[in-house]
Amino acid sequence: MMQRYAVGIEFCGIRYRGWQTQQAGVPSIQETIEKVLSKIADEPIILHGAGRTDAGVHATNMVAHFDTNAIRPQRGWLMGANSQLPKDISIQWIKEMNTDFHARFKATARRYRYVVYNTLNRPALLHKQVTHVYQTLDVDKMMLAARKFEGTHNFETFRAASCQSSQPVRHLSHCRLTRHGRYLVLDIQADGFLHHMVRNIMGCLLEIGQGCYEIEHIDTMFAAQDRKAAGVTAPADGLYFIQAYYPEHFELPQHPLGPHWLNLPDEIPNI
C-alpha cells in the first residue's frame, strides 16, 4: 500500500543549482535527496517541494513529500537518509500523511528571511551564507520602505524577466526589516513568490538604504510594471526559505525558523 510522507529539510545551497532537478550532471537539492530515498526504499522516489529555490539559496525548513510502497519506521527513514546525504543537506523531521496532503499545492503561505551582514569587513566563516554590504545604510528608512510591499500588489517589476508564472499579483502578509547588531534581516511572507521576487525587493531596499532614491519611488516602480524600473537583484547568498504554512488539520511538526545561528524569534517582527 502506498504511503505518503512529509519531510522538513534543511540545506546549505552553496554547492547546488537550486532545488529543482536539473539536466544530467548538474547538482540539485531535489535530485540529491531523491537518490538517497530511492536507495532506502529500493524503488524510485519523487520528491515534491513546497518551493523552488534558486542556485545558492538556503533553507531551514523546506517542506516536501514523497510516496512509497516501502515499509520503514519513521526513525529508520530519518536516520537512514541523514547517514547517506551530504553534510550540507539534512532531513529534520518526517511524518506519515494522508494522500490529500501536497507540499506544494496545499501550502497556504511561504516565508523567507534575507540576511545582510552590514559592516566594513566581510565575514569569512559566513561566506556565501549572508550578503555582505560594507556601505553605511539608513536602516530606519529601509524599515519604512519594507512596509510598502505589504498587501496585494502586481509584482511585475519585482520578478525576473524569465519568470514563468502566469500572473504577477501576490499578497504579502508581512514584509519587515530589523537590525540585530551587524545583521539586517528581512522577514517576508506571502501566498506565493515569483522568481527572484524576494531578492529584487531586497535589492530595492538596499538601494534606498544607500540613498539612491526615496521611499515614494517604490510606488513608481509598481506602476511601471517593468523589471527595468527597479534596481539590482540582491545576491542569493543571504536568502533562506524558512517555512511553508498549511491548514492546521495536517498537524505538521513545529520547527525553529532560523537561520539558527542568528537565534531570532519565530514571531513576526512588530515594528
UniProtKB/Swiss-Prot annotation:
Catalytic activity: uridine(38/39/40) in tRNA = pseudouridine(38/39/40) in tRNA
This enzyme's EC code(s): 5.4.99.12
A Pfam entry, by short name: PseudoU_synth_1
Domain of life: Bacteria
Record-listed substrate binding positions: 112
Keyword field: Isomerase, tRNA processing
Catalytic residues (positions): 54
Single GO MF annotation: tRNA pseudouridine(38-40) synthase activity
Disulfide bond positions: none
Biological process annotations from GO: tRNA pseudouridine synthesis
Database matches in SUPFAM superfamilies: Pseudouridine synthase
UniProt-listed PANTHER family: PSEUDOURIDYLATE SYNTHASE, TRNA PSEUDOURIDINE SYNTHASE-LIKE 1
Family of the protein in this entry: Belongs to the tRNA pseudouridine synthase TruA family.
Protein function: Formation of pseudouridine at positions 38, 39 and 40 in the anticodon stem and loop of transfer RNAs.
Subunit structure: Homodimer.
Name of the protein this chain belongs to: tRNA pseudouridine synthase A
Organism the protein comes from: Acinetobacter baylyi (strain ATCC 33305 / BD413 / ADP1)
Upper lineage: Bacteria, Pseudomonadati, Pseudomonadota, Gammaproteobacteria, Moraxellales
